[in-house]
Amino acid sequence: LVPDWLSFVKGIVDSEDLPLNVSREMLQHNNILKVMKKNITKKAIEMMEELSEDEDNYKNFYENYSKNLKLGLYEDSSNRNKLAKLLRFYTNKNPETLQSLDSYISNMKDDQKDIYYITGESKESVMDSPFVEKLNKQGIEVLFMVDAIDEYTLQQFKDYENKKLVSVTKDGLKLDEEDTKEYETLCQKIKEHLGDKIEKVQISSRIVDSPSCLVTSEFGWSANMERIMKAQALGDDNSRGYMMSKKILELNKDHKIVKELKKRIDNNENDSSTKDITTLLYDVSLLRSGFTMDDTKQFSNRICRMIELGLNLDDDDDDEHSENNVNNDTEASNEEEIAMEQVD
């Protein structure tokens, strides 16, 4: 009598006799049951709407049954807008207080057209994400969607009150116009070095403090969705490879690392350290953007090489150390021979 997402609702329905199947154990499906199911769902939503008027009591209810509401948003298209009004999210402006979508819209800037959100593993991880740096600076509110079910809900929940839901972790986010012409050579060289690891390199309009970040295509999986799908033992490898589209590396043109890298590449300094820095920048972006790293061995080797450079260590130091050991062994051997001759 109730849809799956209302499985937590318990009650008794008083009605006239209903037809049973041959075994007399189950009700036969007929129009009366459909009407009852529709009315029960309607009444349940009305009760939740009344409960939401008291935010303190509704918070306890929402903490226990938010996943059911989001499942309903995914499955029940006829009640999707009503259920969306019942959703609550933490935001970058209100990390400790749950906000409704209506509250978000009322606080939007005059020139803001879309609802921005970020998905992730936890509230703490998305708060420190490089994707919200520029939005924080501009005072734009971002919804934190940190439940695993949010990724599935967003596949059906595309807009609310004629406002599009836009992910801040995907390509296509336009905050400011950036002058990118002088960085074309830098982007091209980095793309050549990283090869098939990325689709392209571009100047970012979303990061302020971080040197770079990795974004996905608008219709591909987010980093959080990739993490969820990799954790599924029975996942389809073919569809996973299709949806895990190549990443786009975005650079912060105002960061000192990017400026120095541009200077070296413009001066044709394509030494091993520059290539290591480029690859390391990609690796760091991979981790900071929420993706998992597959080749940890190569990452560790690059870190060790950068440590050696920082300590002014190179291969010559190793050779010199080896020669000193050989000389010391020779001197010790000669001293032993002299001592034996004196004994004789």
Residue ranges and their predicted role:
Residues 1-344:
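Conserved GHKL (Bergerat-fold) ATPase module
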